[in-house]
Amino acid sequence: MSSSSEISVAGSDVSFEGRLTQHGRHEETPADQLTKILSGRSHEDADGDDAHSDNRSILSRSRRSSTAELSPEMVGRVQSLADVLSRHTSRSGGNIDLSQLSESDRFDAERIIGSFVRDADEQGIHLRKAGVTLEHVSARGADSTAMEGATFGNVLCLPYTIYKAIRDKSGSKMRTILNDVSGLARAGEMVLVLGRPGAGCSSMLKVTAGEIDQFAGGVEGEIMYDGIPQKEMMKRYKPDVIYNGEQDVHFPHLTVQQTLDFAIACKTPSKRVNDVSREEYIASTRDLHATIFGLRHTYHTKVGNDFVRGVSGGERKRVSIAEALVTKGSIYCWDNATRGLDASTALEYAKAIRITTNLLGSTAFVTIYQASENIYETFDKVTVLYTGRQIYFGPIDEAKDYFYRMGYECPPRQVTAEFLTALTDVNGYHKIRPGYENKVPRTAEEFERYWQESPEYRQLLIDIDQYKKEIDTEKTKEIYDQSMQQEKSKHARKKSYYTVSFWEQIRLCTKRGFQRIYGDKAYTVITICSAIIQSLVSGSLYYNTPSSTSGAFSRGGVLYFCLLYYSLMGLANLSFEHRPILQKHKIYSLYHPAAEALGSTIANFPFRMIGMTCFLIIIYFLSGLNRTASSFFRVYLFLTMCSESINALFELIAAGCDNISQANSISGIVMMSISLYSTYMIQLPSMRPWFKWISYILPIRYAFESMLLAEFHGRHMGCGGTLVPSGPGYENIASENQVCAFVGSKPGQSWVLGDDYLRLQFEYEYKHEWRNFGIMWCFLLGYIALKALITEIKRPVKGGGDALIFKKGTRKYHMKLDEEDGELHEIDTKEKFSSRSGSSTTSEDEIFEELESKGIFIWRNVCYTIPYDGGMRQLLDNVSGFCKPGTLTALMGESGAGKTTLLNTLAQRNVGIITGDMLVNGKPIDISFERRTGYVQQQDIHISELTVRESLQFSARMRRAQNVPEEEKMEHVERIIKVLDMEEYADALVGDVGRGLNVEQRKKLSIGVELVAKPDLLLFLDEPTSGLDSQSSWAIVQLLKKLAKAGQSILCTIHQPSATLFEEFDRLLLLKKGGQTVYFGDIGDNSKTLLSYFERNGARKCSPSENPAEYILEAIGAGATASVTEDWHQIWKNSDEFISTEKEVDHLIDQLSNQKTESEFGDAPTKYATSYAYQFKWVLIRTSMSLWRNLDYIMSKMMLMTVGGLYIGFTFYDPGDSYTGLQNTLFAAFISIILSAPAMNQIQARAIAARELFEVRESKSNMFHWSLLLITQYLSEIPYHFLFSAIFFVSSYFPLRTHFQASASAVYYLNYSIMFQLYYIGFGLCVLYMAPNLQSANVILGLCLSFLIAFCGVVQPVSLMPGFWTFMWKTSPYTYFVQNMVGILLHNKPVICRKKELSIFDPPAGQTCQEFTQAFLDKRGGYIANPNATTACEYCIYEVGDDYLKHISASYSYLWRNFGLYWAYIGFNICAMVAIYYIFHVRGVSFKFDRVFKLFSRITRRGKKSN
């Protein structure tokens, strides 16, 4: 019985795959053999040199062959499987079911090679293909190569900044990214695009693929696809041109199968070969591509990303490749698609692309930074770019001769691609033929001039003209049109180039939305649980609200709170992390972005409804609202409509903004509008005319009206204790002498009709209810439609490629613009070419002084096991080895072999069951181990606002001992900058990808951050050359070699080393899948020791021209589809080398265990290199500097506070002295408090990036104490909040026109602009450090804020709270902030009631109003507006503002008591923040959400079975 299994660890490349027999060996299936043969591989290759060479020659010949010209050798390779395909094909109607093939089956070779193309041709199904011509193509972008980064200082000097911006914009210049590029790729050809990072390779691919929106200066020249102009191609046939970017962006919580199935489903043609069903087509296409790229074992594993555990980095890259291929483009542009792949898998990728071009006639442009000779030989043509200029285009076998005639000679054992790329490196090694020293071109301009004057260039232009004459453009269009119509769904629009209809796209996106929700359970569970908890608490707060007039305000408060809670929850929808994925799928033409916008809305709706239903049922019946079915379902209906409308509104805002800071600012203003203009806080009659219109454009106003109408229509509210006058002495008076002191009352009537109350207080009419329903539908559909429209038309921000942004005052121009034509010309390139490579020799020697380490790191029988699928899975299997000072050890293996897992385990970064010994000098590692070792991760994660130099200086200060002089640390940093050749951009900000350092520069910074720490034990490097070109990789390895020679111990994983690069290493640790050792020992001169071991143990002989690194990976069966019969792990266990290694490990342990060692860190090991105070100083400086330069964040915060202050001030402008004015003053203070919600969202969005950096990299190196991350985040926010809250104070306080005395104003400022800011900064961070991610933090924050708001005494007076909950009123800090702010505003303020606020009644005959009510007034307060009248007495409930304060349980006398309580709350927030982070992130306590989804999982499984 066969089984397949897999496991992956976040950030690692560990996986298990394969089909296991009862003896544990890999059983090769015909599917494996088929895929291997199609990729040009065979297990017969192991028989010797001839087979290997023959295999390569077959591939080389097939490179230029058509489908009908496949060689007999290729056919012979598959002849042994002769019968099975016919059986399986006949069963499935021509569709090959790879999952059902078994090894004993045989199939017909001709059918498998020609089945798809031949059957399609026989059935009249057209397959599209087209060549590409580029003529004199140039691309220009904004000249941002040396920009200065803006800071908050620019805001402080705003007038000058505005003037400078206008000046720069008027005189803005463009820079040339691509200059006069030409090329020709016929259908079925592969073109390799070579160049260093920044040379324009990615830009050329984007231009070729029609992705030209980002080029601000536009694209010139002619690009045609078999004669079809690019503009027409993009309009009519966009799906056929695919650009696959370098970054692997996927929905991290989807599994591999879900990811591939979705892409295939979006591209499933309507007319399919042999009329197979849609489900069969999806399954077979997925299985085929997953088999080719070795992904079948990962079907049920999440794709993951840098922060979500999933498949390994190499497997994620393969998912990206497979996803692009299933989109069925005819022209592909692959941007560095082999990044992160091991050498064997990279070669298999190239061969797979070769097969698709041969059999399907597709055209491929590919950039590869480190291409082996085998990969190079799979291509037809190659072009070389040098800083945007083309210096060669032609056949691959003529490129080397072209540059040889130019005067350059390829050094021995240097692969062709490396030779070609090296020519464009001014610092690289160039072997010049004798006599050509002064003739060869050296600068980009000279190379370009030589190329354009060459016969090869003239022949290229002739070939392009000839090709354009040969092709029949109209016939190509006809075939394209017919093919697309065959593929297109019958319900799709006629002019649409999408395969499936818009409604099918929505269905697929909805299904994917459900899968994403199920994959990311934490957020959904937190949302539903928050709703249930909040409803229980709030429902009990309003428990059995009185049905009399005393409960009317509370009933409105319950309904308002329901609306406000779900409005706050809408802020959690401001997500930007998925935007790159939507952009990629738009490029692939999988679906309309609008379909995703609608699909995600539909998918989220049921889960929101679950939470909302639970929420409303609980709060509705606990609070004692109208218990009739009609009222309940009307409230339910309008709450649902409003919630969905507000969610759609916030999603609309996110869709229209470029970043989350902008979205948070705008959403904060919208949130204030929702809170203010619902008509609960300020009613329509009291609204100022300049803002009244806002209430009419928000759905909450109509929802609130209809919900109030459902509650109060027809309700008779008894007066209860609100009769005036009443009490002692008024027991026996007639009813006509009393009145309800409530809006809507009538003289002599002891109750108030709910409809009268709503009409007078709110101007609400029952006839509006269903009108409002129609209006809300318009809002909901309008917001959704606008969101879909903006999502559809939103384009990426225009720019000019990678742009360096320098720290203000330090920028350096390395390029100059020609004033006349704007072209770029490099300065002093010749001088740099000839002299610069030797200028850093001295500094390189200086860096290695006193570097020698005496520590030997040993690991013995290391095993690593983790829980998996209800059991345990072993990822490392008794791995042993050692690293000695002065040695450079390579750690190799295919993707999923356990390289990163081993590094993480040895570096003490894994959590799980770890057994075995890890020793330093024979002794167990101590607490200083992490900081005494360096670890360069695969992910290049840095603080974007710091410069390169500042990042290195911070690492040096934190990682080196405090007793090392500051000058020495900084000198060492400067040496590292020189050695890594980072001087030109040392003062450049790290920035983000595309606007900051490029991939190469980021990788160098990652290495530099560890080198400046001067680790005295060991340096771990995980793929340090990934994403770099061959020259940069060589420079990095040479640096490591020098470090090793100086005494450093280095263990380094490496994926695609060239032969020369590989032989720079001293020792090799080779792993196979399962974390099993295959070899550990010396490599030897020219790899002789290593090759001898493999050849002696059954591997074929390695030819002299082969790359040993590729040879050994092939020998052990590495690769996505490869397999071998030998068990190389068992061979290693039985070898003499293994016995020798074990003996040496034991000898080292015995020898070193009794020796005493010394280090820079002193005798007593410590976890951190520096003191807490020293760490605090520099972490605070770094955090403050980062915030100072984050202008988007600061401006968003300033806009929120400034606009918010003006908004509140002029909404409640001069509220007056009436009773309504008192309420509006209370709400003005209350809404000022609510403004903290979006402000805290802003804080959390920024702080999460610092948390992720610390947890992924800095904490693992014990760089500084974890508490400093929290404290410095808190402290760095304070100055900006103080400043912006001062602006808020001025713009909101004085328009209220209450107290202008300096004393009152100053105390108000102290309460809000100082104390409240200190409070909510800490509160927002406290919630963030509790949550697993930002979205969950937003939900938890909304829950907590709703608690604080509900219990502060505004929406529910404390007098009406159940006795149990009065402690929460006393506990809520918002209670005391509101008390003080309202107390200052209303203290000693006289009250003059308006006419409608007066309670009118008649006194008994013969008495004046004053005489009749005197006893009542003495006890209850208030005043009679007409004391001497004998009829129509006018009673006002309050005489001064302090009476109102007493009613809401506040008092001016509480002022300084509350001030003391503020400090207690602020201190509690800080302590809670530290404690929560310790519990959830240091101790690692986490919650499991799977059980909550158990029922949903069962339903899903049943659904699958039924299908």
From Swiss-Prot:
Gene deletion effect: Leads to increased susceptibility to fluconazole. Also leads to increased susceptibility to 4-nitroquinoline-N-oxide (4-NQO).
Record's bilayer topology term: Multi-pass membrane protein
Record region (Disordered): 1-73
Comp. bias (Basic and acidic residues): 41-55
Annotated Pfam families: ABC2_membrane, ABC2_membrane_7, ABC_tran, ABC_trans_N, PDR_CDR
TM segment ranges: 522-542, 556-576, 605-625, 635-655, 665-685, 773-793, 1193-1213, 1220-1240, 1270-1290, 1314-1334, 1339-1359, 1459-1479
Residues bearing glycans: N55, N336, N626, N659, N878, N1311, N1428
One GO BP annotation of this record: xenobiotic detoxification by transmembrane export across the plasma membrane
Induction field: Expression is increased in clinical azole-resistant isolates, displaying amounts of transcript increasing from 3.3- to 44.3-fold. Expression is controlled by the pleiotropic drug resistance transcription factor PDR1. Expression is increased during biofilm growth. The expression levels are significantly down-regulated after exposure to the combination of fluconazole and tacrolimus (FK506).
Residues reported in the UniProt entry to bind ATP: G893, E894, S895, G896, A897, G898, K899, T900
Domain ABC transporter: 157-412, 857-1099
Domain of life where this protein originates: Eukaryota
Gene Ontology MF terms: ABC-type xenobiotic transporter activity; ATP binding; ATP hydrolysis activity
PROSITE patterns tied to this protein: ABC_TRANSPORTER_1, ABC_TRANSPORTER_2
Keyword line: ATP-binding, Cell membrane, Glycoprotein, Membrane, Nucleotide-binding, Repeat, Transmembrane, Transmembrane helix, Transport
Cellular component aspect of the GO annotation: plasma membrane
Location(s) in or outside the cell: Cell membrane
PANTHER family in the record: ATP-BINDING CASSETTE TRANSPORTER (PTHR19241)
Function: ABC multidrug transporter involved in the response to azoles such as fluconazole, itraconazole, ketoconazole and voriconazole and contributes to the development of PDR1-dependent azole resistance. Plays a role in biofilm tolerance to fluconazole. Also confers resistance to 4-nitroquinoline-N-oxide (4-NQO).
Family: Belongs to the ABC transporter superfamily. ABCG family. PDR (TC 3.A.1.205) subfamily.
Name assigned to this protein: ABC multidrug transporter SNQ2
Organism of provenance: Candida glabrata (strain ATCC 2001 / BCRC 20586 / JCM 3761 / NBRC 0622 / NRRL Y-65 / CBS 138)
